[in-house]
């Protein structure tokens, strides 16, 4: 299922990111902030565990603690730009990495790196990547995780288009997809339009 997270702060910060004049420092800062705002909503249905603590007054207070572990899995390299924003709100989360590159001729995703913490298979996995264009990278990352026994997976992207959304819904109907915005289409080079440019280059200032 697709979830578009609508919030004025997200829309304002996304506008800054779309602006071609925005430098990589501000681009990265706004991506971090949007990621934090999104995970607040994404974890709204998280089932926290009841827990009791003793306060400084000596009284007992009922509260909540994390139950299942949460693992943030950025798709390298652009996904790294969303990791800090999520872990700022969920510092207990562990971090894995999946490395995929896009074949410039076939546009297919190829895996070159996979490293996930040793956690229970029912842990909540947040796959993060700013752009959901063709959906190839996200689709392959999810397949890699499922092949290794993980089933509680959510996909978190900043901007997506119908092509990528349809691919994930077709191949992974059990995976909830979260977007800050749904854009219009892909151009002939498979870039999102209007989009925000090459997310990896704009995060790391490599272009």
UniProtKB/Swiss-Prot annotation:
Name of the protein in its database record: Uracil phosphoribosyltransferase
Binding-site positions, 5-phospho-alpha-D-ribose 1-diphosphate: 77, 102, 129-137, 198
Pathway: Pyrimidine metabolism; UMP biosynthesis via salvage pathway; UMP from uracil: step 1/1
Lineage: Bacteria, Bacillati, Mycoplasmatota, Mycoplasmoidales, Metamycoplasmataceae
One of the protein's GO biological processes: uracil salvage
GO molecular-function terms, A-Z: GTP binding; magnesium ion binding; uracil phosphoribosyltransferase activity
Cofactor (UniProt): Mg(2+)
Family from the record: Belongs to the UPRTase family.
Enzyme kind, highest EC tier: transferase
Keyword tags: Allosteric enzyme, Glycosyltransferase, GTP-binding, Magnesium, Nucleotide-binding, Transferase
EC number of the protein: 2.4.2.9
Note accompanying the cofactor annotation: Binds 1 Mg(2+) ion per subunit. The magnesium is bound as Mg-PRPP.
Signal peptide interval: none
Residues annotated as binding uracil: 192, 197-199
Summary of the function given for this chain in its UniProt record: Catalyzes the conversion of uracil and 5-phospho-alpha-D-ribose 1-diphosphate (PRPP) to UMP and diphosphate.
Reactions the enzyme catalyzes: UMP + diphosphate = 5-phospho-alpha-D-ribose 1-diphosphate + uracil
Keyword field contains Nucleotidyltransferase: no
